[in-house]
Amino acid sequence: MVGVLSMAAAAAPLPVKDYEIEPCKKRRKDDDNSSCETITKYLSPIGKTGDKVFSPPKPSNILHYFRKTSLTTEKPQSTKAYKIKPSPPLLVGNSKDCKTPLEVFSNREFKRKRKRVSLSSQLNDIKIQDECPVEISNNDSKEDGGLSDCVESSASVSLYKEHVEVLAESIEDSRNQPNTKSSKKKVNPKQCTTKSDDRILRKRKRSKVTGQSESVPLADELSLPEDGGKDSKLTKPSLAEENDSRTHATKRADLKESTITVSYEEFVKSHKAAKVEEIPDPAVPACVPSGPGEAVKSGSEGELSGSCEPSPQLHLKTVTVLAQVHPTPPKKKGKIPPIFLKQKQPELENSLSDPENEQPVQKRKSNVVIQEGQLELAVLEAWNSEASVPKCSMEERQQFMRAFRQPPPDTLKNGFKKPLEKQKDPSEKSVHEGDSSSEKIIENPNIQRVSSQGCLQSHADRGSFPKEKSKKPNKKGKKTRTTAGGNREENIQKEKTAFSLKDEQDQNSLRRSVRQKSEVLKSNALLNSENLVCEDTAHDSVQMSLCNRNKSRSSSTPTRDMVTHHRAEPGSSLEYVSTRQPIRRSLRSCSTPATNALGGTESEDAQDTIPVKASTPKSARTSEKHNLYTAELIIVSSDSESPIRMKFTRISTPKKSKKSSKKSETTEEELTSQKKKANSTSKNISKAKELIEEAKAFQIGGSKTEETVVPLRRSSRHQARSAKEKSPEIDDSVIVIDSSPTSIREPEKSQKKLQNLNDVLGKKLNKSSKNVPGKMKIAPLFLAKRTKRAAIPVFDLDESSQDSSEQTQDCDVQFKAKRDFLMSGLPDLLKRQIAKKAAALDVYNAVSTSFQRVVHVQQKDDEYWLWHLKPPSCPLLTEFKELNTKVTDLSEYVVAFGEFSTLNPNPRSNPAAVMMRTRKDFTKEVRNLLLEEIKCSNPEFSLEKYFPLLLKKRIEHQVLCEGHGKQASPQLQPDVSQKETKRKQVATGNQKSKRKRQNEYSVSPEEMKGRSKDLDERISSSCTNLDPSRDSGTEDMLWTEKYQPQNSNELIGNELAVKKLHSWLKDWKRRAELEERHNLKGKRDEKEEGILDLSDSTDFKGSSDDEENRLCNTVLITGPTGVGKTAAVYACAQELGFKIFEVNASSQRSGRQILSQLKEATQSHQVDKQGVNSQKPCFFNNYNIGKSPKKLNSPGKVVTSPRKLPPSSPKTSGQKRALLPKTLANYFKVSSKSKSNDDVGALMGDDKGVKNSSLEQRQLIQTKSTNANNSHIKDVGAEESNRKKATSLILFEEVDVIFDEDAGFLNAVKTFMATTKRPVILTTSDPTFSLVFDGCFEEINFSIPSLLNVASYLQVICLVENFRTDFKDFVTLLTANACDIRKSILYLQFWIRSGGGILEERPLSHCRENSRNTLVCSEDGSDANINSKKPKRNRVALPRCDTGCAEALFGLKNIASPSQDLLSLLKHKITTKEEWQKLIQVLTEFHVQNIDLLHSNLEVILPLPVHVVPDVRGAYGFPVTTQASAPASMGHLTRKQSKDQPLRKSQKRKQKKMVILDDSDLFDTGLDFSGELPSLSPAPSLSVEDNIRRDSNPEIKTQNSGFKPHSVPQPPKTLAEKKCCMLVSHCLNSLSEFMENMSFIDALLTDPGEQNELGRSAFHWTNGRVKSGLCDEFSLENRDRWAPQSAGELKATAEALSFTECSSTISKALESLNSCKQLERDPTNELTVCVSQRRHDACFRQSAANLDNADKRMAVIKSVFSSRSFLTLGNKQASIIDYLPTLRNICRTEKLKEQEKNKRRFLHYFEGIHLEIPEETITTLAADFP
């Protein structure tokens, strides 16, 4: 077709061997301008059809709109003005020896700088004036450089010879070899294309696609033969020539220009002779693909081969075109774009006037237009490469845009910005617009195959034709793809001017070509891309062209090349092909134009001659819709010449193109004759293909457009990158889009695609709207979504493989675009953080690739090596079972009886072990005997105070159960009135305070005796009446509430702390009463006098203020769990009349909720008026209790807590009764009106009513006087008068327990403390909480009560419940529970309600030897009363004792038989494996419970004789007697905590202080103390306690008298004595060995439980306290890998082995005891172990009853080792052993020195060495060891 103008201008020499043309012998230099001759003659066209066809002359140049004031100084004839340095030579053709030089136009034409010259007009001028032969070179890619050189030096255009015969043959061959053509096309572009060629090719492709889409039908017919010929003959030469052209690029540049003159008539005749076999112009083979697929492939090659070599037959006539350059016409007014004005013939004449006349006046524009009516003209443009294109001003640009009234295209989908688009060349625009045209050109390869003359004609035709096309796009601009608006308008103007003025267009084209030498390559590349894109779709071609444009802009090579467009025209079948010149803006930005050889890429040389084909976007789309056009780009690089021109040739006029043709009728009138000819030849084909297109458009319509919208653009970009990587030596690589090779029938497919594109652009506006300029700004991600919606399956698409890959790329790009869009508003810092996180995640993923991905369906992967590891080689580890990972299907199995259960016959046990749930009530005599037993076990416990209270509570509970039993049936009935009447009747009884009645028993011992007697009688008489089954009812009341203390006197232990709390609450009560009186007085005074008594008020206020300042409103109670903190608060509050609001850890207690619930209660003291509910506690709860579902079918006997009494349900409430406001939110909404008696009765719940009835019964039982009721009423009235109004008290339980939901809890507590007018009590079990919690509060410390008293208390409870228990069991239980009263009581309830323990026959145990005969009792009268019944004692049947409470707690009954005692199990000799396993299991259980069973009970389980040493002062020895009472002992415990209320040490305690431990006891557990350590009586160092005991006890004294040390020397030992000593030492050695082993185990195996205690155990030896939070990190992690169970098992095994060895050794040693006795020497006394009574009673763990001595020792240790001198010591146990004895000796010595008063001023030794130990500690060290 049309050869590249730059190549033609460069006049690259044709290879001599191929074309028989003499090579150029001299390379034109920049300064070699003398050779340029002015074209003085015109070669008149053969036919005058051009005159007929072309419309009246119009301004041919778009520069008319942008032209600035002409520069008179510029003279077109001056050659010096255009001197430029030679750009790097670029070979245009593939032929190795392109030696025919091109004669460049005369220099005077190119001296006009900054003037746009239309190429076609220049060609016309050249033709007419100078008839200088223009040679069209076949060089493809690298001829551009040569062209540029030639153009710089010469002003003559030489047309290449083209051989018609060869073309005909090549066409036939091309039919046979269409596929080879495409494959070669693929190869050639890579080898022989420069980057400029790439750009040109892309542009051409698009222009050709747009122009060709309509001409496809005709072009197909023509292209099939032509392509064949081209393929067969030119494919190989093109490849070889491309390689040669690369190698000989410089040689071609150096060759002199040789002109081959061909008679134009002969050329046209020969051309017409071979219509079907169109002359394969050097560009033709490259430009003409047999099918769209080939076209695409050949696009790149065709671009390169734009100047394909002419076939070797060079005898064809040469066409010599003489063109004269005309001066540019006068500047027109810029206001009205001349594109809309039809130019008249005079304008044409003016444009054709002699350029010399007008040169000095203004810029010259010359359009050389060669008009051939039926032949396609090859426009040969020459220009001076030196000229640079001036940029138009903003005004001109805006005017141009306004003229077209089309918004500038937004950034295209390929990402180009507006500024880039502004710089785009018209060629680029035309490329975009010419997507369809380029496709059409590809489809019409015949158009591309044009002889040199045909190319000139086609140029003329193109110059005239764009006008027609430009009109169409204007009308349908919205539907067409457009590049920059300015470029579009320029293209349109150029087209119109081309129609009007062929000559002018020729001149302009020549000037433009001069301007755009360097852009030849660019246009080639663009057109090549267009060709490639043509196959895919017009849209893709647009995108690719844009990419190429960007590349061409970015790389500006100052080469000016002459572009010669060759078109082989099959007779008149081919219509005008309008070639537009590239956009001037792009020319300015990048100076390397590229010529596109559209169609066949086989003959790359021919590609050079093919003009750049592009179309304006509108024209492109309209042409696609209605007509197929061949668009050729005429590039002009000269500043003084017109901008780029597009030449369009309309191939066919399908039906669809009627509208567009009508719109452009005015412009097409002159071309009608040629159109008719073209239509006549291609009418049938076009119709047939239209039908095919329409049929398949419905199927493939949407999919193609989708595919070509974005993906191909990106694919072209990626391919361009890959091409650059492959050919780094080339600046701009040709982007080759390879599609699957197509057969000869592929033109139909390409037509189908184009037709489909027409449908998309014309009919389916929603799809084509993506290309509308106004919508260019839409992000590609949104466009992609639309395309996905419109997706239709694609059928028979050549580029389907490309689309699939490009769609995936598009998805990635869309995702990135979406992410970038969403992150566009983020700050940089956040972006960096996100990027850093993403990078870290990538690194982590990369690192973790070796690990299996976690899948929640099946974690195990059988193929993974990790699941098939080899078994370990260790023989001990090879016996593991195989891991069975198979999941069994349970549905397949039928569960049968016995499969998961076994039926074992229960062995007949002792009938004594039968479980019984209920027991008969004890008789009076039995109860008294058991009370005597309890009294003897612990004489210090006051039975007279606790037993009556507990018994009354039990009777009350029984009556409650009876009341529930009576109301069981009415409860289930829906009748409310009946239940209400019953409640009222029950509630009418006198309401006496429980506390008052309970206190009646403590009025005096005499009253208590009488009442207990009466009570015993009553119970004994009613044993038959009271059904024992009533206890079997479901008991909903815990014993901790059932036996809850109602008075402060009922509490056990902590007497001082309770008194302090009671006094504090009493002060608050007094303060509240004073404030209440003040308020009442103020109101009365206001009512009566209206004026307050100032003096009284001020006095009262002052007193109240003083009291308020004195009183702290908050008390913090600390102490271990279960010692009675909360019970003490409730007891004191109930005694003093406080209403308690409890907030415990069981409810959600966030700060906001607490403040909202309690804000009313915190503002006043009084919270309730006088009434029944005044003393009921209120619990903080988030949930509405009244709305909770009621148990309708609850058991008959349900007993609830008297303290935590839930509100009655609506069903059980009366009509006038409202729900009790238990929730704090509703509490303050209670009406303040006083209730009548009926209302009070109605407000009482069932439980309350029953309780009152039970109280009434108890009153009747306890009081027999007739006026008892009146007295009780008086008492109640007095008590209620004291508590008219309940004072509020808020209680926060467990303030140290804070959950995640309790946000702001402590802050809310602090707010209450700061703002409330009521007392606040906080309880906590954390001793360090007071250090962490900030605030003003008083601290009250509760400690562990006396273990013996608690044990006696539990025995009394069991006695009240009709159970006889063993005191030793309770001591053991409390020892295991750390004396937790609540826990022990709850477990006791569970144990008793489960049936109790093992029943054993056991006589009464008494503390005296003579207790069997007479019961020694205390001074209580009750005991005297029992003594009076002494004669009946022998006749009373004592109940059997329930034992095994502690064993049941530890589950030992499951290990040993129920009847087997634990100590018997330990003493039993192990003979079987089962027994050994039992022993290990028992020891393990105790180790898990942190109990050292063997060490604690060693003296009992060893086979040594044991002697229990009773103390003279009591059954439990000295430590018990020192505590005259439980309160005294508790005083010792709380002395160091309650500093403000110190207790004096009892004198007895001071007198009896003894040193009973040596230093070895310092590192014991602290629970053991010296008197309880196992010690052999013959020990050399006897303790003081033992000496005292021997002195006091005559029996012990006589036994051990022989072993007392004597001052006199003893006689030598006899044989018997030696033997006895050996026996004793052997036993001692065994025992010491066992202790050594135990010590080693303790050191080796650390207790895992200690590490879980937040590390506090590490600080127990110092005074330091660990604040909460400092050791939290250790709480979640166990450093010791040994689990508690494993560590316990290991320790138990070692301990059992060691103990078994020790026991067996001692047993063997004792076998020789008889032999010693035979020698009249009995070592039994020496082997006997003396054990105190309390040590003997305790089991499992040594008693914690008296911890004073241990506490004193620990206090000394903490004080000493907390000083700075000892803080750095490591092992604390070793430090204690090393330092403490020495420090004690020093302190004693210093104490003696101080007493002797040797010096006037005594300086202690520790002060001299600056050892900072407190004076109190020094005094303690100097004293005897505690």
UniProtKB/Swiss-Prot annotation:
Compositional bias ranges of the Low complexity kind: 298-311
Tissue specificity statement from the Swiss-Prot or TrEMBL entry: Expressed ubiquitously in all cell lines like teratocarcinoma, cell lymphoma, lymphoma.
Positions contributing to ATP binding: 1119-1126
Crosslink feature (Glycyl lysine isopeptide (Lys-Gly) (interchain with G-Cter in SUMO2)) location: 127
Keywords: ATP-binding, DNA damage, Isopeptide bond, Nucleotide-binding, Nucleus, Phosphoprotein, Ubl conjugation
PTM description: ATR may stimulate the RAD9A dissociation.
Biased composition (Basic residues): 469-481
Disulfide bonds: none
Chain spans, region Interaction with WDR48: 365-381
Sequence ranges of Basic and acidic residues compositional bias: 243-254, 418-442, 459-468, 487-505, 1006-1019
The protein's name in its UniProt record: ATPase family AAA domain-containing protein 5
The organism of origin for this protein: Mus musculus (Mouse)
